[in-house]
Amino acid sequence: TGFDPFLIYPEYLLLLLNELNSSGAEAISINEQRIISTSEIRLAGNHIVINGEKFSRPFVFKVIGDGQTLQSAIQLRGGIVDLLNSNYIQVTIKKEEEITIAKYSGLVDFDYILSNEEQEQ
């Protein structure tokens, strides 16, 4: 299959997510899905799956952190915002005084990590 200019590929979301994380984001959600270390972001047909839920445009990132630092990081010349814009993806940045990001509501299942209670048994 060829490149679809109207489809947002998960790689774009992951690049933005990584830039925000490396710039000090303390909490991030995409379309109200809290992002944690085990969150999946993948393509499924014409949708992006985030934490098991299907989404399509628009994608709204909510980010808690130092607004100036985060904005500067993603707006570097030749950075992620330039990449998105060059791929026909419009980016709008809006600073808010107060942002609420819900806690992760899914299950976190680990195979190799034990809780303190499990270790004591």
What is the role of each PLM region?
Residues 1-5, 118-119:
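Low-complexity, polar-biased intrinsically disordered regions enriched in Pro/Ser/Thr/Gly
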Residues 3-85:
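Soluble extracytoplasmic domains of inner/organellar membrane proteins
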Residues 64-121:
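Extracytoplasmic/luminal low-complexity segments enriched in Pro/Gly and acidic/polar residues
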